[in-house]
Amino acid sequence: MDANDILFLKTVIEKFGGGPVGIETIAQAMNDEKDTLEDVVEPYLVACGFIQRSKKGRVATELAYRHFGLIKEDSL
């Protein structure tokens, strides 16, 4: 996991409460290109089980929260 992967996850978790949040909103918050996130960052995070795509946007999984030593509120 590189710095962009970590920033993506922390953005979704910390700025958007774990999601769902749209990719364009994430890109703007990260000051990055939507296409870069969709083509480079997101596929890795989805494959690792850290992010799920939904119709409403991207959602951080419980695994993503655990990776940072956090507890996902809806899993309490």
Where are these regions (language model features)?
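Hydrophobic residues on short alpha-helical segments
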Residues: 2-13
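Terminal-proximal interaction/regulatory segments of ATP-powered molecular machines
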Residues: 12-76
